[in-house]
Structure formats: structure tokens, C-alpha cells
Amino acid sequence: MRGLEAPGAVGPTGPSGAPGSQGPDGDVGGMGPEGPKGDDGPVGPKGPQGAAIF
């Protein structure tokens, strides 16, 4: 009866895997600062004339 043969050498390392998929988009940035104060309104109308003094 023939003796068992020694096992063969280990094969070469396989190829590297494919790169992973891209991660998700980041969150939306926060709200910007408050805008500047608006311009002052126009001057109001002229008041009524005072009573005549006699």
C-alpha cells in the first residue's frame, strides 16, 4: 500500500477587492445670520394748523 503524499504548497494571495461605495451626502448647513436692519420710513405728514389768536 502506497503512503499518503505530502499536501501541496499554499496558493498565491487572491486579488484585492473592489473599492467601497461612496458615503452619503453631508447634512445641509445651518441658516445664515440675520440680515441688516431696513431703512427708516419717510417723514410723516405735516400736522394741522393751530387756531388763530385774535
UniProtKB/Swiss-Prot annotation:
Q: Which Pfam families match?
A: Collagen
Residue ranges, compositional bias (Gly residues): 26-35
Q: Where is the composition biased (Low complexity)?
A: 42-54
Disordered: annotated span? 1-54
The residue ranges of the Collagen-like domain are 7-51
Q: Known InterPro entries for this protein?
A: Collagen
Return the protein name: Putative collagen-like domain-containing protein 065L
Q: Which organism is it from?
A: Frog virus 3 (isolate Goorha) (FV-3)
